[in-house]
Amino acid sequence: MFSFDALLQAIARQTVLCVGDLMLDEFVYGEVSRISPEAPAPVIAVQRSETNIGGAGNVARNIAAIGARCIFVGLIGDDATGRFLESELGSESRIEPVLVCDGSRPTTRKVRFVSEHFSTHMLRADWETASPAAADIEQRLLDAILPQLARADIVLLSDYAKGVLTARVIRDTIDAAKKLGKRVIVDPKSANFAIYRGATLLTPNRKEFTAATRSAAATDDEIAAAAQDAMALAECEAMLVTKSEHGMTLVPRGGEPIHVPALPVKVRDVSGAGDTVAAVLAVVLASGANWAAAMRAASAAAAVAVSKNGTAVVTPAELRRRILPHASLAAEEKIIGSDAELDERLKQWRREGLRVGFTNGCFDILHPGHVKVLTAARGACDRLIVGLNSDASVRRLKGESRPVQHERARAEVLAALEAVDLVAIFEEDTPLRLITRIEPSVLVKGGDYTREQVVGHEIVAAKGGDVLLVDVLPGFSTTSLVARAREGQS
């Protein structure tokens, strides 16, 4: 039986040596509503901007985000962009950057101008020198790469054709890795797959595959046939062709193709999705999974990546939500462990335009009255967060004999309900701090309160939100249930 937790534990033990073209990705978001009076060119009214580690650096970030360690070897120029990337990579606890500085070229930088409303790219500006690294830089790159091979469980070459992965660097790295029994995954850019000879797996997209094989690659059968010829030339074990919304096809040498459909998702930005696929394939294969399991994980990760704006990474929690059935996520994914985790989930929901609701309570012994309030609350919003009093908070409010169930047990019961999307445990006597942080669009309590008695009502009202009071079911309360149980025992 598939165990996601066991997979994550195995991933955490892996080290990936990632080599490739590092770049800075900048995204400038805005809208165009007029043409410049100076020239027939659109004027972009800038609303915000984001800066991310891109190219092979994004592969390294995804390796680290999913829980593995990454030794990253890349090239930077002697400029502010290079120093910024070096600092950013150095701040990642799971990434060990080994960067070579080439003062003869700029650090690659790409600036994309994107419609905030439609998430469409309007323009891209590049600062780069794409020529192969000079012989002395090649040697410095190899001096950085080869000593790290023994420490790695798997090697990943991320080729953006920006000068790092020259024919010599590719050849010497693959040959040295094979001598040590290390598998090598290549995300190729060159149409000459023969330069990657001896790699374990090549992961071209359909356009790259078509250019390299000169095949139409219009059907899975055509891809499989062309892949067998390409693998014979490249002497690799398998080829994975990514096909955007049509999923991906893996062709093992001499074996039957494996097709995995794309997961349904609203696509916001495809930038860096190939990086995510390569990273997840590497760490999952290094962990001992087979081709099918690695493809399944990579497909799920790609679905998460394209649903985000900009160059994005995928976390274990996001991957879990895509891979596992919804019902199995309750205790593990619905219970928030930190404010940062809560903020990230809120950011994602608001990016999707979802209406967030909030209710709270001790929920010591869940009864039909609770279920009615929770169901009504979920019906008034798109995502419901339940604030749960901690054990210490319950004791202060209800007395030393309470709670009957400890906070983790209460949280797991709530998380198992379909109406509940998140459970946040709070230590204070009231959920005011949580409400202030969340700023819900809907605040829900039982009808035994008045609007003015509902903690946080003024915060919600100030933001244009609603306060909803749900009629309580008579005869149902935790206090009365506990009292009746004790009377029965005596």
From Swiss-Prot:
The active site is at D275. One of its GO terms (cellular component) is cytosol. In the N-terminal section; belongs to the carbohydrate kinase PfkB family. It is an enzyme of class 2 (transferase). Pfam families: CTP_transf_like, PfkB. This is Bifunctional protein HldE. GO terms for biological process: ADP-L-glycero-beta-D-manno-heptose biosynthetic process. Homodimer. Signal peptide: none annotated. It catalyses: D-glycero-beta-D-manno-heptose 7-phosphate + ATP = D-glycero-beta-D-manno-heptose 1,7-bisphosphate + ADP + H(+); D-glycero-beta-D-manno-heptose 1-phosphate + ATP + H(+) = ADP-D-glycero-beta-D-manno-heptose + diphosphate. Pathway: Nucleotide-sugar biosynthesis; ADP-L-glycero-beta-D-manno-heptose biosynthesis; ADP-L-glycero-beta-D-manno-heptose from D-glycero-beta-D-manno-heptose 7-phosphate: step 1/4; Nucleotide-sugar biosynthesis; ADP-L-glycero-beta-D-manno-heptose biosynthesis; ADP-L-glycero-beta-D-manno-heptose from D-glycero-beta-D-manno-heptose 7-phosphate: step 3/4. Catalyzes the ADP transfer from ATP to D-glycero-beta-D-manno-heptose 1-phosphate, yielding ADP-D-glycero-beta-D-manno-heptose. InterPro entries: Bifunc_HldE, Carboh/pur_kinase_PfkB_CS, Cyt_trans-like, PfkB_dom, RfaE_dom_I, RfaE_dom_II, Ribokinase-like, Rossmann-like_a/b/a_fold.
